[in-house]
A protein has these predicted regions:
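Sec-dependent N-terminal signal peptides
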Residues: 4-13
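Protruding loop/beta-arch "assembly-hinge" segments enriched in small, turn-prone residues
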Residues: 433-437, 441-459
Length: 459
């Protein structure tokens, strides 16, 4: 009888008390391995502080998962110097369980992605991106399973289905994430289902609605800082911001028990060995990028929160440099998402600043487009969240029937970022000079930046 009671007690214990798992979550680091100034606060974030915090949690908890929702490499000077090689080589120190593929992982094609995955020694996930390359076919998995005290956690990675509209999608095929998740959950035995997503909140909501058995969606792509989880039915969704500013903490037993987060604030301790590695990288960057190109007597507004919703003088500086590609232009425009310095600038402007201002390698092109379609482009650009258009048009009023010569970047000229009205235009010229070089030339010519010099009427 005693033996029977003991067996029943064990069974009841197993049913009622699932093991607690601590899930740590990050997203949209965009190559910020050193601390940055964020919203006016210096020394925020940084890979080294993140590492120390993660290891503290691991030391205090038996079961820990460390997951990232993608866009890990591209977007800073650290990426520009070697396409992410040095960023990737830091990843083995922190030991992520998995990172979802974000759209910016593809900005320089699958060859660069392959090298970064090899150097990172980290498992990357995407169930709905399919590769032609043999190495990437094997290296990027659709899912992983992590077992804690007999409970199987199925973690499926998904990437935005709009990938073709956002990045270089040569040599890959992108399928519907909902379809791919459904295929996997029919085939794999699991107890808990986590979606590691770089789809964006709207698509995550669709996934949650379509598959209500999901236990948790860890999201990214929008750069949102959630204060609490959002729920679609019983499915919790969370995002943990950008640039390594914070780490999300989710306690999980049978269900999500709690969600909080830790901001990587200036006073947090960093790891001495990692600090040495990053200092070595910084020394290399300083050596090759410290040349002063100009001095700004005005504050150039580059913080993302302002750029997302307004035209700024830094945007005007970038447009001024683009205009030098084709002097016969009628209009010049670029999406604010192409400008990523995320801080205001004053005083000496260096080569390093240029690489942060323009981290992407898009060509400068001239598009011939009818006035009515140009109006549609401008209208769209003023409705965008996080992608507000920086632009200048010579005509005070656009003639719907006139054909305009418009300078822009190849990214939105291809209709990406929702600028599909460019399909009515035609690319007639491509500048042989990259945008960073045009900006460097412009800064050297200006020497001193003033409001007057940023007035297009004075060019």
């Amino acid at each position: 009888m005693k033996k029977l009671i003991l067996i029943l007690a064990l069974l009841i214990g197993n049913i009622c008390f699932a093991s607690e798992v601590m899930i740590l979550h990050t997203s949209d680091t965009h190559g910020r391995i050193s601390p940055i100034e964020y919203n006016g606060v210096k020394n925020m974030g940084g890979f080294s502080k993140r590492l120390v915090f993660v290891n503290e949690i691991r030391n205090k908890n038996k079961n820990v998962l460390l997951l990232d929702s993608g866009d890990y490499f591209q977007g800073s000077i650290y990426y520009r110097i070697d396409y992410g090689k040095r960023i990737a080589k830091l990843l083995p120190d922190i030991k992520y369980d998995a990172i979802a593929l974000g759209n910016h992982e593809f900005d320089n094609g699958t060859k660069v992605l392959k090298h970064n995955i090899k150097n990172s020694k980290t498992q990357f996930l995407s169930a709905n991106v399919h590769f032609k390359d043999r190495y990437l076919k094997n290296a990027v998995k659709p899912y992983i399973i992590k077992e804690f005290d007999g409970e199987r956690f199925l973690i499926i990675g998904v990437t935005t289905s709009s990938l073709a509209n956002l990045s270089d999608t040569n040599n890959i095929t992108v399928t519907n994430p909902i379809d791919e998740i459904n295929k996997i959950i029919k085939q794999v035995k699991y107890d808990r289902l986590i979606i590691l997503s770089h789809c964006g909140l709207d698509e995550d909501r669709q996934i949650a609605k379509a598959i209500p058995s999901i236990d948790l969606i860890l999201g990214g792509h929008n750069h949102y800082f959630f204060q609490t989880t959002e729920r679609v039915g019983n499915v919790p969704i969370v995002q943990d911001g950008e640039f390594g500013i914070r780490v999300g903490e989710l306690k999980f037993d049978k269900n999500l028990k709690s969600y909080t987060y830790k901001n990587m604030t200036p006073e947090l301790i960093s790891d001495a060995n990692v600090d040495k590695k990053i200092e070595k990288i910084n020394h290399h960057i300083k050596k090759v990028t410290s040349e002063v190109l100009a001095n700004s007597q005005i504050v150039l507004i580059g913080n993302q929160s302002t750029l997302e919703h307004n035209q700024t003088n830094l945007g005007k500086l970038v447009l001024t440099s683009m205009a030098k590609a084709f002097p016969e232009y009628d209009a010049v425009l670029t999406n604010s998402g192409s400008i990523r310095v995320n801080r205001n600038l004053k005083g000496n402007i260096t080569y390093a600043d240029v690489l942060e201002i323009l981290p992407f390698d898009n060509d400068i092109v001239m598009v011939e487009i009818q006035g009515k379609h140009l109006n549609e482009v401008l209208f769209h650009g003023q409705q965008q969240n996080r992608r507000y258009l920086q632009y200048y048009v010579k005509d005070k009023k656009i003639d719907n029937n006139k054909v305009y010569k418009v300078i822009t970047n190849s990214y939105i000229a291809q209709g990406k970022d929702g600028y599909d009205n460019f399909k009515y235009g035609k690319v007639v010229k491509k500048s042989p000079v990259p945008p960073t070089k045009l900006l460097i030339q412009t800064l050297k010519e200006m020497q001193v930046i003033t409001d007057k010099k940023l007035n297009f009427e004075n060019l």
